[in-house]
């Protein structure tokens, strides 16, 4: 009998990196939980994604407001309208991927996220995640945690695949079980392959074949 997978525990993220979706693919038949009880963490994928523009890697950051400062629960983090970020992110995506093979194919589903106004970062990320899963044809269910599990607890280390703090733009360590497969990128010849960008990069460049890249990025 096949051994069941441990629960996959992830943080909420803005258009998460490819490795995040590789782990989702791996646990498609298992239990997946997104951390809903932590305090907000700065300089993380929770409100930041990385894309590849004509001048190199570019970070897109959603400005946020923290009603309780550093102790603000992740579900209470508010999106700030400071700096017209929606317009800037939409323009950055069009500049980076407007000439990519599948940008127009997905634009009608994804670009409206930069027109709607969301109050909470959690809600924006969750709805965008659902749309991304649908475009990838990745049929899975996830739930929100109901209590905080300390990362060093025995339960987190033995019963979970805990990647809440492993997947970070500040860490270069490989994600356990993931060996990212290179794929076509618009600026490949000039810049070489840049791995683990936002899933938007993979979708806009590879379209329906994105799911195959996720599959082939799992280490045996």
Regions found by a protein language model. Name each.
Residues 2-220:
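Residues lining hydrophobic/aromatic ligand-binding pockets adjacent to catalytic sites
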């Amino acid at each position: 009998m096949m051994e069941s997978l441990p629960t996959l525990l992830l943080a909420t993220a803005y258009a998460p990196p490819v490795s995040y979706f590789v782990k989702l693919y791996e646990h498609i038949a298992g239990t997946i939980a997104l951390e809903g009880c932590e305090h907000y963490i700065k300089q993380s994928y929770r409100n930041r994604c990385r894309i590849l523009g004509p001048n190199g890697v570019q970070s897109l950051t959603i400005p946020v407001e923290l009603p309780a400062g550093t102790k603000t629960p992740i579900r209470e983090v508010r999106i700030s309208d400071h700096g017209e970020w929606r317009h800037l992110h939409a323009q950055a995506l069009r500049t980076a991927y407007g000439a990519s093979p599948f940008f127009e194919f997905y634009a009608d589903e994804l670009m409206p996220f930069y027109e709607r106004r969301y109050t909470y970062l959690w809600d924006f990320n969750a709805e965008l995640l659902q749309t991304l899963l649908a475009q990838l044809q990745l049929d899975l269910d996830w739930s929100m945690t109901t209590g905080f599990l300390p990362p060093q607890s025995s339960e987190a280390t033995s019963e979970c695949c805990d990647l809440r703090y492993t997947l970070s733009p500040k860490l270069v360590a490989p994600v356990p079980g993931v060996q990212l497969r290179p794929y076509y990128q618009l600026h490949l010849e000039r810049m070489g392959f840049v791995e683990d960008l936002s899933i938007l990069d993979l979708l806009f460049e590879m379209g329906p074949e994105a799911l195959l890249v996720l599959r082939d990025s799992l280490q045996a």
